[in-house]
């Protein structure tokens, strides 16, 4: 531990507040809150931790803290700090999980819509529906039962919906405000839980139609009743008070937290939400952070009541969210919390089972690959690929797989330095020489298997450098592609012999992942360099632009396209003098010069 950390830990206050953990660049990597800052912050640097927390602690070189007057203030501050700094180790609940709502528009001739975009308008919103299919089925039923306008724009003649009895055709007929209000009121009654009442009314109308020998009408009403029954069958009544509430449960294991939310609407359990994420805090603190972010999402409306597990400070939740929060001791609500807890525990168990199963499969694939090639199990595999499009910016890339999984910190990029023109074989010789000369010099771990993305020529070039120049005898195989540029087979030995693998085997899938990954890494690097060279060459003829300013512009804008779209002011903001900014702008505006 850094000495200055020990000094700061010794003077931490025993008050509530927030703490910000920083890495060696001074970047905030984690924000947390605590009832007692002294105890919580010190706990990171004492005792035993799981692997994820150890990784976090290993990156901490400094921290700050902010004392607050209460736990509630700490919770609010924490959420704001997470928004501001976006730390990589914090819970990241994104707003992309939006649920659909059913909307009745406030137009003169209202419409019934499905939307995920809730606006502050005069429309009426019902939901959310975590199950999108349920929302669409409900709307489809309402469209059949209540003839509101369907078209977004008023056509000049009636459409098919009018002939189907699903629209009153306000485009060509007068539909009064009273008529629309009557229909809208019926829809609202249905969506607010009045299914039984609506069903009863339809049943009465069906019998009346039968008595009048209006069999087509009776059949239509019977079908509507059947649709209501089908939808209601999926939403069983679990609470008799018809209160809208969200019921929370959670479980923690192996450094992960799973939170399950049951959405109870009008007494019915309509759906659940599952979130799973790494946790570096006490479970109760992690849960409070989660619930704060959960209701910041625009698709999560606060219900009348929030039900939380017994370990959570419900008073704090209530004051923070400004909604009733309860901790049931008995009864149906307690049963629901326990069910949510149980589901969260099962979800974590399934996650770890799948991880362990995948790890077993991956290790087995590595072992089988070694057997197929007649070598020791290649726990560490390094793979090389060249990228050279039209002879410009030749590069190579090396990736590493350890225990069958990508080790991205071990990846390396190489600009080709000694080869003139496009020469794949010489490029391969150069990068293999550079990689393993450095590995020997610095005592870096050597691979159990080297894979060269290429055929016999590439393999021969790499083997020659490895054995004859460096004196290393590491198993090396060439990865051969088919005519569709897909993984075909390996070649190994001297002379190289093909090794065919079963295409549905785990070891073949492993090779595919390695080939795809090294190709992706190499070509991404090539495109980055190519993009930079395009920008630099485009700026060569502009007066006042030397290498230093080229680098500044490249770093600020990133692409020629963005530079061409920029204004004089934006070039000044990038650090260019105004006269130079005007020159750049004029030059790039003249497309003939590019």
Swiss-Prot record:
Family: Belongs to the UvrC family.
Keyword vocabulary terms for this entry: Cytoplasm, DNA damage, DNA excision, DNA repair, Excision nuclease, SOS response
CC per GO annotation: cytoplasm; excinuclease repair complex
Upper classification of the organism: Bacteria, Bacillati, Bacillota, Bacilli, Bacillales
Domain of life: Bacteria
Chief location of this protein within or outside the cell: cytoplasm
Gene: uvrC
Domain GIY-YIG: 14-91
Subcellular location: Cytoplasm
UniProt entry tagged with the keyword Heme: no
Protein known as: UvrABC system protein C
Reported function: The UvrABC repair system catalyzes the recognition and processing of DNA lesions. UvrC both incises the 5' and 3' sides of the lesion. The N-terminal half is responsible for the 3' incision and the C-terminal half is responsible for the 5' incision.
Annotated PANTHER family: UVRABC SYSTEM PROTEIN C, UVRC/OXIDOREDUCTASE
GO biological processes: nucleotide-excision repair; SOS response
Pfam family, one: UvrC_RNaseH
Quaternary structure (record): Interacts with UvrB in an incision complex.
